[in-house]
Amino acid sequence: SDLVHLRIFVGAASEVQFMDLKKFYINGQFVDPVSCELFDIINPATEESIGKVALGSPGDVDKAVFAARNAFAKTSRLSKQDRLEILKTIRENYKKRYDDIAAAVRTEMGAPVKLAEGGQTATGLGHLKTAIHVLEGHEFEYNHGDYIIREEPIGVCGLITPWNWPINQIVSKMAPAFAAGCTVVL
């Protein structure tokens, strides 16, 4: 089922070494990029390389969008309860990996401990909590005078995030997209 697939993703993502990101997660599995171009991740505080990340190409984007479009056919039909379960599972895994996420933010951004843990990592967790709270109280279909308004997922969301607020911006964009029933390409 779709929930099983998403649980597999969340579990697989928890096994990723943060600074050795040479594969992309596309269509339920980690895959090699179309091109082999790698980019050094530099800690701005030390100016040292802390790992490498694969650079995506138009071919990688096409593969990811194609997979996300195919997944959208099913995820767009997930119930509100299923979407809540997905967000809660992500939140629980986020909590379990909190220290790892904070360490990754610290080294990737060269951020002080308080900023990485409190400003970045905690804020990401707060975005998940807010998305869950909003979704719990949201109705996707309601009467408006003589009309029925039905809110439906729009499709694949392309998420672009800055280097200086990485986890915060990922979560603040991903959580509402998942709550709405959309798929994402990050």
How should each PLM-predicted stretch be described?
Residues 1-18:
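N-terminal amphipathic/basic-hydrophobic helices that include classical n-h-c signal peptides
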Residues 3, 27, 160-162:
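Intrinsically disordered regions, especially transient/low-confidence alpha-helical propensity segments
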Residues 6-7, 58, 62, 147, ...:
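Hydrophobic residues within membrane-embedded alpha helices
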Residues 13-145:
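N-terminal Rossmann-like NAD(P)+-binding subdomain of aldehyde/semialdehyde dehydrogenases
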Residues 138-186:
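Conserved small-residue-rich beta-alpha loop and adjacent elements
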